[in-house]
Amino acid sequence: VLMTNSDVVVMVDDGWKDLWSLRNENPLNDAETLRYGVKGQIIELGKKPNSLSDIDGQYTGLIKISHHKIKDFISFYDQLDRFILYEGREFKQMYMTTFLQLLIDAGWTIMPARVNHGWLEVDTVDDLKLYERLSEEGKLDVLWKVNE
C-alpha cells in the first residue's frame, strides 16, 4: 500500500475467491463488486455482484491517504448530508466502500495496491474457528503464511 503512488490507495486481494469459498458455500453471498477502469483505477466497489465477472478483486479494508490530500478527504466527509441514507444506511453507519464510491463518483482517483492472499477476513466467530482449525491442520498457509 505504501509503495503504490496515488493520493488514495486501497489494498485489493486478487485471490479473494479462495478465502470467500472457504467461508461461504456461495462466495457471491458475501462478496462485493470491485471493478477496474482502463488505467487500473477502481471505478466501482461495494455493490452486490450479479456474477463473478463483477468482481476483479476484494477490498480488504486497508486504505492510505497521502498527506497532501488528507484535508480534502476530511472535508469531503464533513460536507456529506447527515440526513439522507447511503446505500440504505444512516450516515453514521455508512460503509467505507460507500464512502469510497462517493469519492470515485466525485472524480477522485482511487488506485489498488494488489495482493494475492496474505490477509484473513474475520467477520464471525465461525470464521475465527475455521482459521484456527486450518492452522492446526497445517492448511492455512495457502491463504496466509504465519511464519514469514
Language-model region placement:
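Conserved alpha/beta core of the MobA/IspD/sugar-nucleotide pyrophosphorylase nucleotidyltransferase superfamily
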Residues: 52-148
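Conserved core of the sugar-phosphate nucleotidyltransferase
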Residues: 1-76, 80
